[in-house]
């Protein structure tokens, strides 16, 4: 998501340190949300990640050191969190990373975005497979307003990654063509 936002904003020439650290923190928080709310899919959202990101548990270094341990977070999310803590010892560095990521996630504070991104009934895993009915997904974005471009870029990226997974399962070729227009 961090890369999608950078690309949609014309970024990519910025300092890779900040982008990488934002991505690492985002990965840790997504893992946190997936583990803590494993039985409640309605809370496995970017909006929930944003709430945690802007809490004292992330900004206050002393609280942050205990945050994942108190919630019994394990494996990759814990490793990513520890990597973040290792880099973000100073208030300025931590503020820069958290502030940059919060800016990129700000769209998930908008009620309309929360509503449409909270769940999906589109079976993207069926794209490119044999099926009885054709599937069409329309994504509209005005040329003059790039406000929601990061979310649209993320959706397209997710679809492309799923298409690669699907093709990998079927001898590196999709059973049905998929067109992006």
Regions found by a protein language model. Give the residues of each.
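P-loop NTPase motor domains
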Residues: 1-181
């Amino acid at each position: 998501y961090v890369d999608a936002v950078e690309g949609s904003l014309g970024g990519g020439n910025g300092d890779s340190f900040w982008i990488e650290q934002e991505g690492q923190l985002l990965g840790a928080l997504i893992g946190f949300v997936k583990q803590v709310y494993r039985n409640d899919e309605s809370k496995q959202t970017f909006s929930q990640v944003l709430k945690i990101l802007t809490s004292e548990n992330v900004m206050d270094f002393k609280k942050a050191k205990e945050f994942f341990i108190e919630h019994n977070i394990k494996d990759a999310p814990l490793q990513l969190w520890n990597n973040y803590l290792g880099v973000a010892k100073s208030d300025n560095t931590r503020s820069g990373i958290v502030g940059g990521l919060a800016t990129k996630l700000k769209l998930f504070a908008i009620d309309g975005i929360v509503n449409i991104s909270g769940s999906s009934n589109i079976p993207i895993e069926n794209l490119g497979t044999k099926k009885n009915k054709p599937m069409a997904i329309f994504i509209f974005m005005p040329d003059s307003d790039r406000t929601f471009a990061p979310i649209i870029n993320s959706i397209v990226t997710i679809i492309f990654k799923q298409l690669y997974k699907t093709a990998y399962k079927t001898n590196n070729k999709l059973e049905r063509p998929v067109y992006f227009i």
